[in-house]
């Protein structure tokens, strides 16, 4: 059994502090390197995120931005790590899940590794796949999912994707993975979602 985890808003709550800071850094980067004002930079950032699943993809495709330079300057660990909120239930959950656990994130590798360490759960993961490891093709692109399955020689039917993004799970389901949507308070469950959970710790119930 293979458990594939997203990072932000799945293993930790990124929306309160981490995401707003990253968004500000991305906007500042666009202002400096594309020479546009703040309103235009915000529009571009949001447009590319909506269209491609990551602002970076649009900047690379349409403006020739160096992806590594962008990721390094928009994910400063000295600013972001103090904003990461830890939850002991996450480690408790990972300990009780049988099989391998890996990370598949649209974040850069240095950020993923640092956040897992900050959360105290890095030892649970046998592999980590950040954007650099999947050729900068972010979810919901199928490339990242296929890369994980191929490199780990895992079967889709024996693999589980745990995500807060329904769009990403749509791709995972199309590829044959089992899908778990972490969506607190969400009443609906789309056909491509096998399980909808309010809390990550509810995963343990799926293997009892």
Would you name each region that the model predicts?
Residues 13, 103-105, 181:
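Hydrophobic residues in well-ordered beta-strands that form the structural core
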């Amino acid at each position: 059994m293979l458990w594939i985890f997203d990072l932000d808003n799945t293993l930790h709550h990124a929306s309160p502090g981490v995401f707003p800071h990253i968004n500000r850094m991305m906007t500042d980067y666009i202002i400096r390197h594309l020479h546009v004002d703040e309103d235009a930079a915000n529009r571009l950032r949001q447009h590319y995120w909506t269209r491609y699943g990551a602002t970076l993809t649009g900047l690379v495709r349409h403006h020739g931005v160096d992806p590594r330079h962008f990721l390094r300057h928009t994910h400063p660990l000295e600013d972001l790590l103090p904003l990461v909120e830890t939850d002991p239930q996450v480690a408790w959950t990972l300990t009780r899940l049988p099989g391998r656990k890996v990370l598949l994130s649209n974040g850069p590798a240095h950020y993923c590794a640092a956040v897992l360490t900050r959360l105290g759960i890095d030892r649970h993961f046998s592999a980590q796949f950040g954007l650099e490891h999947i050729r900068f093709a972010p979810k919901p692109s199928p490339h990242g999912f296929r890369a994980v399955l191929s490199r780990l020689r895992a079967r889709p039917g024996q693999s589980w994707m745990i995500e807060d993004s329904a769009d990403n799970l749509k791709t995972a389901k199309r590829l044959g993975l089992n899908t778990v949507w972490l969506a607190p308070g969400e009443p609906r469950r789309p056909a491509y979602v096998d399980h909808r959970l309010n809390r990550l710790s509810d995963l343990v119930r799926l293997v009892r």
